[in-house]
């Protein structure tokens, strides 16, 4: 039997007909975005939210401190020296979660990925290389790392970034936006007056985008 990442699961409505796999940022865990789920306004839909915990690993930029991380960060310019091994491992682990949802009867076109910061990097990397088209990706305050995962299948993307982000600067988000558009992605780009975080307006926009992307009309 396959071993999966430990996950928090929250079901909104029923029967379950779609799934969102949501990846947290560096140093957080699957509970980080759990309070966001009810705020998305999708209670009427049959959506299963899967919020996995990243493995623990040493993180170079944090003096080797062991924390939950999807891959090692060796610098804060988010360019150049990329932890390809860590990215490949996390991509494979998330792909396994997608396959599990397929095994639960969810069509690939009803599975969306979401991620914040380096969680968004993995979500984008999985969706662009996945053999079946997914419903789309919610990429928050993130960037697409250099490597083979920066090429592949065009997909629907909701990308959002804080204009005052001190960690992953807006320019890096804009570079990723341009790369995704060059790949032919159906991209929705939003900016918000905030730092490296999320805000209520953004959460409302994510909820509306997920509702449309999962193919379920809003209630009257």
Language model region names:
Residues 18, 155-156:
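Alpha/beta-hydrolase fold active-site loops
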């Amino acid at each position: 039997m396959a071993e999966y990442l430990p996950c928090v699961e929250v079901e909104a409505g029923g029967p379950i007909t779609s799934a969102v796999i949501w990846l947290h940022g560096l140093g957080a865990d699957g509970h980080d975005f759990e309070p966001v789920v009810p705020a998305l306004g999708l209670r009427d839909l049959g959506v299963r939210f899967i919020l996995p915990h990243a493995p623990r690993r040493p993180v170079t930029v944090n003096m080797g401190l062991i924390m939950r991380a999807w891959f090692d960060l060796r610098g804060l310019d988010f360019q150049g020296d990329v932890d390809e091994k860590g990215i490949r491992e996390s991509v494979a682990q998330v792909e396994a979660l997608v396959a599990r949802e397929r095994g639960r009867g969810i069509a690939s076109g009803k599975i969306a990925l979401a991620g914040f910061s380096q969680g968004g990097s993995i979500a984008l990397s999985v969706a662009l290389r996945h053999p079946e088209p997914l419903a789309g990706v919610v990429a928050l305050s993130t960037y697409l790392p250099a490597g083979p995962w920066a090429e592949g299948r065009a997909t629907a993307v909701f990308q959002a970034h804080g204009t005052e982000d001190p960690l992953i600067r807006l320019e890096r988000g804009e570079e990723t936006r341009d790369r995704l558009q060059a790949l032919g992605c159906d991209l929705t780009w939003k900016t918000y007056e905030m730092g490296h975080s999320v805000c209520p307006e953004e959460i409302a926009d994510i909820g509306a985008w997920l509702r449309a992307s999962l193919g379920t009309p809003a209630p009257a």
